[in-house]
Regions:
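Fe(II)/2-oxoglutarate
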Residues: 1-23
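Non-heme Fe(II)/2-oxoglutarate
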Residues: 16-113
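A generic fold-level signal
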Residues: 21, 121-124, 147-150, 165
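Residues in well-ordered beta-strands of folded domains
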Residues: 90, 128-130, 141, 155-157, ...
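Alpha-helix-centered segments that form part of catalytic cores
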Residues: 111-131
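Short, conserved beta-strand element in jelly-roll/cupin
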Residues: 129-134, 147-164
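Histidine-centered catalytic micro-motifs
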Residues: 138-145
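Catalytic core of Fe(II)/2-oxoglutarate
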Residues: 150, 161, 165-217
Length: 217
């Protein structure tokens, strides 16, 4: 257990989170990480040995900023978050697959899912740290790589909104069937996080196999 993070995750109102995910495809949660934990994660950005790859976003026309992929082994806090958050998100992912007429295929625990990824040659860890300066941004995109991927992503804010930076809202664009797209601009407080769907989801009020998609920035 990393400074009680397991207990904090277990204490979340998961029934409310599942309801939000089903209704709108994302769920915003108040601070889960403490200020000192956020500071510790920010400080890691300058520790070269922790990362396997650095991406200059402007070089690839992804936006303006940069991010770094962690290499194995992951920092204990990040590993603990992955292991504790995955099971409930897997429940939601399987529920949505069934509503779309597909077989529930996500294991109940993280390790069997990672083993499934490894069997498909997907062995590199994907958690990352992003860094933006004034004027930085991330273009709309969907993060789905390889034959096996998990349909949810979780993002944490590590700085203080309106103190360390201004703006910086997280943009989700919902692509709805037979309707115009709808945007959601979400401000995340320090230590808070956002769960969001990055692939097809069933649409409330429509036939079970009707889908909507989300694009992120």
């Amino acid at each position: 257990m990393i400074n009680g993070i397991d207990k904090r995750v277990d204490a979340l109102d998961w029934a409310l989170l599942h309801e939000a995910l089903d209704l709108q495809g994302f769920a915003e949660i108040p601070a889960l990480l403490r200020e000192d934990e956020c500071a510790s994660l920010r400080a890691m950005y300058e520790e070269e040995a922790r990362f396997r790859t650095r991406i200059d976003m402007a070089r690839y026309r992804f936006g303006i900023g940069e991010y770094r992929y962690f290499q194995a082994p992951l920092p204990p806090l990040i590993q603990s978050l992955r292991e504790r958050l995955y099971p409930e998100l897997a429940v939601a992912a399987n529920r949505w697959l069934q509503r779309l007429g597909q077989e529930a295929s996500y294991p109940a625990a993280l390790q069997p899912f990672l083993e499934q990824c490894h069997r498909h040659g997907q062995s590199r860890p994907t958690p990352l740290l992003s860094k933006y300066e004034a004027g930085g941004y991330n273009c709309l995109h969907q993060d789905m790589y390889g034959d096996v991927y998990f349909p949810f992503q979780v993002v944490f804010a590590l700085n203080r909104r309106d103190i360390d930076y201004a703006g910086g809202e997280f943009m989700l664009v919902e692509q709805r069937p037979r309707a115009q797209s709808r945007g959601h601009a979400i401000a995340i407080e320090q230590g808070g996080r956002l769960y969001f769907r990055r692939s097809a989801a069933p649409c409330p009020g429509h036939a079970e196999r009707t889908r909507r998609r989300y694009v992120t920035a």
